[in-house]
């Protein structure tokens, strides 16, 4: 589209609950309530977008992002900083905006987009996070069929603004976990067509930004499915092989062996790998699994690595999981692919965190929430926050959720809060995150 665009679409409301003075930077004398997403509305008056896709991504994501920043008690300055960063760095790499009948590159973040918002809750407060797959239109028209190039273009921009980002691990791990240009050249057209057809979602990279009050922490997720199909490896061989390739001194080998033994025993394969984009010596590696057998017994088995983790944190965390699982009424049973596609149900997921100097892997469980009414989830979360010394979160959780999905019936909706992740340490207590899906 030739013209540049600004201003809010006519259906965007400005009537959310008011923000406190220090969050908005505005006088408390105003008679009209100040909308939570005032920073979004203000920036919209000054932002020009080069195409309609960036314009649509901004107006789709920024209102909810702005509200989350207010709810997380970010200063007014950081609210504008992080919203501007989204507009200038992230929106340009979200690709063609998906709409009915438009045949564009597909990712499943947030349910149907290339971007997902989430919130982390601890006793110290909440943190807003954004995850996305960098993509450009070339992935939709066949020039970059496996979307290999967009992530590098994004990192070149991110490093200009976020000096703490170190992409050494991106280069080292990409070789082992993603389809490289050399791999693609070595495949004939028949093989390429097969992979393009068999993999409805071709995601190989996802970038996540923790928008902390102390600054941004960047993480990268590597999805080795296409690489494994081309090379004949298992996901576990690819992920643990990649870790060992960069862990030259073997600091993580005993942790890897512990996790690998459980994977072999439980007949589960690694799904993807995550690392912090920092100095490789200080990064955390997280190996993920996704299990369609959604039962508490299976979750317990994975949480304890088949009984291999017997420390106090694991035991206390397991008791909390049992309570949450029962209260939430997690929809159980083996999930067939049709149930995931047609009913939108999700598997259980876990990750196992490893870091040099760490004695044991740290498990984190992702409980699938789709199919459960949003208000029920919110009531359970409110009660949980009250029990675990998070009174501020308990007071506002339900109200905040309704603000994120303004005008939606949360008594009937069952697909907005998609995942609840949980980890536990005695030092910090419960560590929970909610991952949000976009309305259809």
Swiss-Prot record:
Region annotation (Disordered) ranges: 1-33
UniProt cross-references to PANTHER family, sorted A to Z: INDOLE PRENYLTRANSFERASE TDIB-RELATED, PRENYLTRANSFERASE ASQH2-RELATED
Annotated GO biological process: alkaloid metabolic process; protein prenylation; proteolysis
Keywords: Aminopeptidase, Hydrolase, Prenyltransferase, Protease, Transferase
GO molecular function, one term: aminopeptidase activity
Annotated positions binding substrate: 108, 116, 223
Reactions that this protein is recorded to catalyse: harmol + dimethylallyl diphosphate = 6-(3-dimethylallyl)harmol + diphosphate; an N-terminal L-tryptophanyl-L-alpha-aminoacyl-[peptide] + H2O = an N-terminal L-alpha-aminoacyl-[peptide] + L-tryptophan; (R)-benzodiazepinedione + dimethylallyl diphosphate = (2S,3R,11R)-aszonalenin + diphosphate; (S)-benzodiazepinedione + dimethylallyl diphosphate = (2S,3R,11S)-aszonalenin + diphosphate
Entry EC no(s): 2.5.1.-, 3.4.11.17
Domain of life according to the entry: Eukaryota
Composition bias, Polar residues: 20-32
Protein function: Accepts only dimethylallyl diphosphate (DMAPP) as the prenyl donor but shows broad substrate specificities toward its aromatic substrates. Also shows tryptophan aminopeptidase activity with preference for linear peptides containing a tryptophanyl moiety at the N-terminus.
Family classification: Belongs to the tryptophan dimethylallyltransferase family.
InterPro entries named among the record's database cross-references: Aro_prenylTrfase, Aro_prenylTrfase_DMATS, DMATS-type_fun
Sites where the protein binds dimethylallyl diphosphate: 129, 219, 221, 286, 288, 366, 431, 435
Name listed for the protein in its UniProt record: Cyclic dipeptide prenyltransferase
């Amino acid at each position: 589209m030739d013209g540049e665009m600004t201003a809010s679409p006519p259906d965007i409301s400005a009537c959310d609950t008011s923000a406190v003075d220090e969050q908005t930077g505005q006088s408390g004398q105003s008679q009209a309530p100040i909308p939570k997403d005032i920073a979004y509305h203000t920036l919209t008056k000054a932002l020009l977008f080069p195409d309609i896709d960036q314009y649509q991504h901004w107006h789709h994501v920024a209102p909810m992002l702005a509200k989350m920043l207010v709810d997380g008690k970010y200063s007014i300055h950081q609210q504008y900083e992080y919203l501007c960063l989204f507009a200038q760095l992230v929106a340009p790499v979200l690709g063609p905006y998906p709409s009915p009948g438009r045949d564009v590159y597909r990712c499943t973040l947030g349910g149907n987009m290339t971007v997902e918002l989430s919130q982390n809750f601890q006793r110290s407060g909440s943190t807003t996070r954004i995850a996305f797959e960098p993509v450009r239109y070339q992935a939709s028209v066949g020039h970059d069929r496996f979307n290999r190039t967009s992530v590098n273009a994004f990192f070149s921009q991110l490093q200009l603004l976020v000096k703490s980002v170190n992409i050494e691990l991106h280069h080292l791990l990409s070789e082992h976990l993603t389809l490289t240009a050399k791999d693609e050249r070595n495949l004939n057209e028949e093989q390429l067509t097969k992979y393009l057809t068999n993999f409805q979602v071709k995601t190989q990279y996802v970038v996540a930004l923790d928008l902390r009050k102390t600054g941004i922490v960047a993480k990268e997720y590597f999805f080795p499915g296409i690489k494994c199909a081309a090379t004949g490896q298992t996901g576990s061989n690819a992920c643990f092989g990649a870790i060992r390739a960069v862990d030259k001194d073997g600091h993580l080998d005993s942790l890897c062996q512990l996790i690998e033994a459980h994977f072999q025993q439980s007949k589960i394969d690694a799904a993807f790998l995550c690392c912090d984009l920092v100095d490789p010596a200080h990064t955390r590696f997280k190996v993920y699994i996704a299990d369609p057998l959604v039962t508490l017994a299976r979750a317990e088995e994975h949480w304890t690595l088949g009984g291999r983790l017997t420390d106090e944190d694991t035991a206390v965390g397991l008791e909390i999981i049992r309570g949450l699982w029962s209260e939430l009424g997690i929809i159980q049973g083996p999930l067939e692919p049709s149930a995931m596609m047609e009913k939108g149900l999700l598997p259980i997921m876990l990750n196992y965190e490893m870091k040099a100097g760490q004695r044991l892997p740290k498990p984190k469980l992702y409980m699938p929430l789709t199919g459960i009414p949003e208000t029920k989830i919110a009531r359970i979360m409110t009660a949980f926050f009250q029990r675990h010394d998070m009174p501020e979160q308990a007071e506002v959780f339900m109200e905040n959720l309704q603000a994120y999905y303004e005008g939606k019936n949360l008594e009937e909706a069952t697909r907005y809060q998609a995942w609840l992740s949980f980890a536990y340490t005695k030092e910090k207590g419960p560590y929970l995150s909610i991952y949000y899906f976009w309305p259809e």
